[in-house]
């Protein structure tokens, strides 16, 4: 059971850690959660008994500890072989005569949805050197077309069924598997039948023909090109170093330029026939459908599939090589200086027993304990900004313990020594019982919360959990069983066992150290070897004290507030309660999410409390303000207070308000309210979190973005707001002026300003919830309200440019980007039009995908988005952008002009419109049943009562859009004389000449925008 991530809320590993782990899966990620330990993969045998589905009766209720831990004498289905963990009785398992394995279950969360996963036991580790990237290439070809589906038609079919490509239908390829995923929002019998037919055809008979290969080659190459970055290059070098001599070291799923360029239809077909076989396939389905019907559909569409030739043996994934190079220095100017250690051990199969899992839980406690000590040390001022440890059975190739360190400044030797000393202390000296109890309760709480919310676990989560478990030869259990097993292992979590676990995890048959620096250092390799091998003394004073921090440690608030107004809102059972101090509560007790309570607090005026020309360093606030503490409690004390509970401290800045949001529980939400209220009443000002925020900026900042994608991410949003300082990307020069005194001067009055609005939705009792708010926010003094000046409530769009603004990046010359944007509007008066603009953007987005990606392969991720700020009267825009090769930039501009002209000249077809409306119809039907949807729509209603009406009309505004509406919006807004554009090229590359934009003679109907007079500009 992988439970460490669920409990490690306190520790946020730096992105450097991701570089240590094996090759990133390519395409959309498939979430993995709650797998249990590893087991040998059982070779399916087609026998009469195997053909019959194993269909245990669903449990009547939560299984008791005794019942769930009792071993069953009945034959176990394929998923639970080699295991004594209690089976999740909701699943029904079976094996077809051809060896295909399946698992199905009924689940009505969300209602009417069915989630399907088809997992193929083939990934990049099955490729020969000359086949690098073939597994991923075939994933693309399978989605493109197959025996039963014409080229590109599967996407359109699923759109008509309400499934949005990239969200509801997608695929991923990893080192060890390829998984095809479809979530049908409203699964009719016909839609289910069609979807299983398409998926079966995809994996058994894709169109691997020269024409399709040539078309999709450009798409795969574009995906590879867009993924190139200093981080990805460092990841490749890291894996090659760590896993030297093993396939994992040099088998990235994306492949190489040479192998992708040289891939032929015959070679790809041979790879498919070798590895795409029914006996290497798992079909997992969960959803609002009869399991018997689902099983029959699996049999109907997959039974006739037969593998070509004998089943090939799996390649040998190798073992860590102790003789390989132990230290390495990588020069990477565009990534942070970092030090990474890895302790490698051979990966072996283990029977998936309760005892094995409970032993692993001791490992999790040991790692979490070290991570807490590292986090506390970093917060208190050390030579490292962040450090973390993690255990991973990487791609069934190694069992490894990873250490990642991000030093402050260039003194990486000191940072390495300090981190090793903290680990050494854990290796030598057993932790106290209080240390273990502190970590135990964190994981226990996370698992208990999973039990409390298990009735609303989505079908997509369930199939992803099962497929993820198969991926690494594990099983999965229900949340209550997982909690039982965890609690049953508590007796093993003794100080001596935790210490012994630490010693085992920080020992390996091969140990390696990697240093990443920004420039050449002739002595770095020798210094790394010395620092890595030097004996280390255990750290002193890193163990945490046992002083209890409770809610009583917080400063007291005043007397509970009195209610001035209590009335129903007239919608959804929401109640509006106004206290005498001006605080307003919107309360909706409901069971939509059992075990969850959502809390949202709004106050002040957000970005509008600052001038668009004022550099207020808003980027520093989320990571600094809450970490500064409350009253006399610093960050470490608050961590103790929050430990093992559904409590959090998060701060956000909206256009018109500051926010504090949390997802709590029925047991903890009252204390969550008190935390937020006390933060407003007794803010603490601490230099340490601010210093860490500044240090993080200095560590990660690059003067020039390191890729085209980075340049777009950093600059486009800021430039489309006409260089509004409130959203400006941070620079070290900004941080130099950011002192604690200045930070306090800016934020102390803003925390005290403006009436407070509280939303409380979820699993609460009405009277208790009202009392809790009265005792917290109702107890605050009445707050004044400084209304922002009119100039702060303006959002600008840049003036039109005759030639695109040129942005530079410092990456590959092959990487470029392009952006075209048109001003639209803002505010609430034209809210219906704003929502229909989003549908126009969806249609443009689909046309970009169909042409630039599917047909031409010019771009992998073209996009179109409409942004309409409801709280500003101006500043909205519709933007299209993409990454591509520099020489294709003129083509992008020409094609966008053609799309815009066509949309303005003629209505879209009924089918094209329906393929965009139907996914939105299904999405809104699901969203409107959620607390999160209504909270997001009604936020700010105490100041603007129109929010309720707008929320009620949202669905109709979106779904009633007509082809004539789309044409009118294109004519009104997508005009050459108002548009702004930019191109991104590598530093030193000359942008290509662009064709002249089409002229529109009539400018009388051009939209009103607040635009600056700035002309073309050059920016990094």
Language-model-derived ranges and their functions:
Residues 2-14:
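Bacterial N-terminal signal peptides that target proteins for export
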Residues 221-230, 700:
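Carboxylate/His-rich catalytic cores and anion/metal-binding grooves
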Residues 26-104, 290-361, 367-379, 435-441, ...:
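Proteolytic maturation boundary segments
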Residues 12-22:
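Bacterial N-terminal signal peptides
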Residues 272, 650, 747:
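Conserved, carboxylate-rich catalytic/transport cores that coordinate ions
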Residues 103-105, 110-137, 152-201, 232-258, ...:
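M16 family metallopeptidases and their MPP-like homologs
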């Amino acid at each position: 059971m992988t439970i460490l991530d669920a409990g490690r809320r306190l520790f946020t590993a730096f992105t450097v850690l991701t570089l240590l782990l094996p090759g990133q899966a390519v395409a959309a990620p498939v979430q993995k959660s709650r797998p249990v330990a590893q087991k040998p993969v059982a070779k399916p045998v087609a026998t009469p008994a195997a053909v019959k589905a194993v269909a245990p009766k669903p449990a009547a209720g939560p299984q008791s500890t005794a019942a769930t831990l009792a071993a069953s004498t009945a034959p176990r289905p394929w998923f639970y072989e080699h295991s004594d963990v209690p089976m999740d009785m909701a699943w029904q398992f079976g094996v077809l005569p051809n060896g295909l394995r399946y698992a199905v279950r009924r689940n009505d969360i969300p209602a009417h949805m069915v989630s399907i996963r088809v997992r193929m036991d083939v990934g990049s580790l099955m490729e020969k050197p000359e086949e690098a990237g073939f597994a991923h290439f075939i994933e693309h070809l399978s989605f493109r077309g197959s025996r039963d589906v014409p080229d590109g038609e599967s996407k359109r079919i699923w759109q008509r069924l309400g499934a949005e490509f990239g969200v509801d239908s997608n695929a991923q390829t990893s080192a060890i598997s390829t998984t095809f995923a479809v979530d049908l929002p409203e699964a009719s019998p016909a839609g289910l039948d069609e979807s299983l037919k398409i998926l079966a055809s995809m994996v058994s008979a894709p169109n691997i023909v020269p024409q399709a290969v040539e078309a999709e080659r450009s798409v795969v190459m574009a995906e590879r090109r867009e993924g190139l970055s200093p981080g990805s290059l460092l990841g490749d070098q890291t894996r090659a170093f760590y896993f030297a001599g093993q396939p994992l070291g040099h088998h990235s799923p994306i492949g190489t330029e040479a192998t992708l360029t040289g891939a032929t239809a015959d070679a790809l077909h041979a790879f498919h026939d070798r590895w795409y076989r029914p006996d290497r396939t798992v079909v997992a389905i969960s959803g609002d459908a009869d399991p018997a019907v689902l099983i029959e559909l699996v049999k109907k569409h997959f039974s006739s599939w037969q593998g070509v030739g004998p089943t090939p043996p799996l390649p040998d994934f190798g073992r860590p090589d102790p003789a390989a190079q132990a230290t390495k220095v990588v020069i990477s100017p565009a990534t942070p200086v970092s030090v990474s250690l890895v302790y490698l051990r051979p990966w072996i199969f283990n029977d998936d027993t309760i005892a094995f899992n409970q032993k692993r839980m001791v490992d999790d406690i040991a790692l979490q304990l070290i991570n807490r000590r590292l986090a506390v040390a970093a917060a208190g001022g050390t030579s490292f900004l962040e450090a973390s440890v993690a255990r991973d059975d990487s791609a069934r190739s190694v069992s490894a313990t990873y250490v990642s360190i991000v030093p402050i400044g260039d003194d990486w030797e000191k940072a390495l020594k300090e981190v090793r000393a903290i680990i050494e202390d854990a290796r030598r000296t057993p932790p106290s019982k209080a240390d273990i109890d502190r970590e135990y309760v964190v994981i226990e709480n996370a698992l208990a919360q999973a039990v409390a919310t298990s009735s609303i676990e989505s079908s997509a989560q369930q199939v992803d959990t099962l497929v993820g478990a198969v991926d690494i030869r594990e099983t999965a259990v229900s949340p209550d069983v997982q909690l039982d097993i965890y609690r049953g292992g508590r007796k093993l979590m003794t100080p001596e066992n935790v210490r012994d676990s630490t010693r085992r995890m920080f020992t390996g048959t091969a140990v390696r150290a990697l240093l990443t620096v920004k420039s050449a250092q002739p002595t770095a390799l020798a210094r790394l070897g010395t620092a890595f091998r030097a004996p280390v003394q255990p750290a002193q004073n890193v163990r945490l004290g046992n002083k209890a921090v409770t809610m009583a440690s917080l400063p007291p608030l005043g007397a509970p507030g009195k209610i001035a107004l209590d009335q129903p809102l007239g919608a959804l059972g929401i109640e509006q309660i106004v206290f005498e101090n001006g605080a307003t509560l919107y309360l909706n007790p409901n069971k939509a999410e059992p075990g969850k309570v959502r809390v949202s607090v709004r106050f002040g005026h957000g970005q509008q409390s600052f001038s668009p020309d004022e550099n207020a360093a808003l980027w520093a606030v989320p990571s600094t303000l809450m970490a500064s503490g409350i009253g006399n409690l610093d960050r470490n004390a608050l961590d103790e207070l929050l430990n093992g509970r559904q409590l959090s401290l998060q701060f956000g800045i909206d256009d018109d308000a500051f926010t504090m949001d949390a997802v709590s529980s029925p047991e903890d939400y009252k204390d969550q309210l008190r935390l937020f209220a006390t933060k407003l009443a007794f803010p603490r000002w601490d230099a340490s979190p601010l210093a860490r925020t500044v240090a993080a900026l200095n560590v990660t900042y690059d003067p020039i973005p390191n890729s085209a994608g980075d340049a777009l991410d950093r600059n486009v949003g800021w430039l489309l707001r006409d260089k509004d300082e409130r959203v400006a990307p941070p620079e070290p020069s900004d941080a130099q002026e950011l002192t604690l005194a200045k930070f306090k001067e800016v934020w102390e009055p803003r925390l005290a300003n403006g009436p407070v609005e509280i939303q409380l939705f979820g699993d609460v009792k009405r009277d208790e919830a009202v009392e809790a708010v009265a005792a917290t926010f109702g107890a605050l003094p009445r707050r004044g309200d400084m209304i922002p000046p009119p100039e702060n409530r303006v959002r600008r769009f840049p003036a039109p440019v005759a030639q695109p603004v040129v942005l530079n990046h410092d990456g590959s010359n092959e990487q470029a980007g392009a952006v075209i944007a048109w001003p639209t509007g803002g505010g609430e008066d034209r809210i219906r039009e704003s929502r229909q603009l989003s549908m126009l953007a969806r249609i443009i987005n689909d046309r970009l995908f169909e042409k630039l990606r599917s047909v031409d392969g010019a771009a992998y991720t073209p996009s179109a988005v409409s942004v309409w700020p409801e709280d500003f009267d101006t500043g909205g825009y519709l933007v299209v952008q993409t990454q591509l090769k520099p020489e294709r930039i003129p083509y992008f501009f020409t094609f966008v002009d053609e799309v815009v002209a066509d949309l303005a000249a003629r209505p879209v077809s009924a089918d094209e419109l329906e393929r965009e409306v139907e996914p939105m119809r299904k999405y809104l039907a699901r969203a409107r049943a959620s607390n999160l949807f209504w909270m997001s729509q009604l936020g700010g209603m105490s100041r603007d009562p129109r929010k309720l009406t707008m929320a009620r009309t949202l669905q109709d505004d979106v779904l009633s859009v007509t082809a004539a509406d789309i044409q009118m919006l294109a004519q009104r807004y997508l005009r050459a004389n108002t548009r702004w554009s930019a191109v991104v090229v590598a530093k030193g590359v000359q942008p290509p000449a662009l064709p002249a934009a089409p002229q529109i003679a009539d400018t009388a109907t051009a939209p009103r925008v607040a635009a600056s007079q700035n002309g073309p500009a050059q920016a990094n």
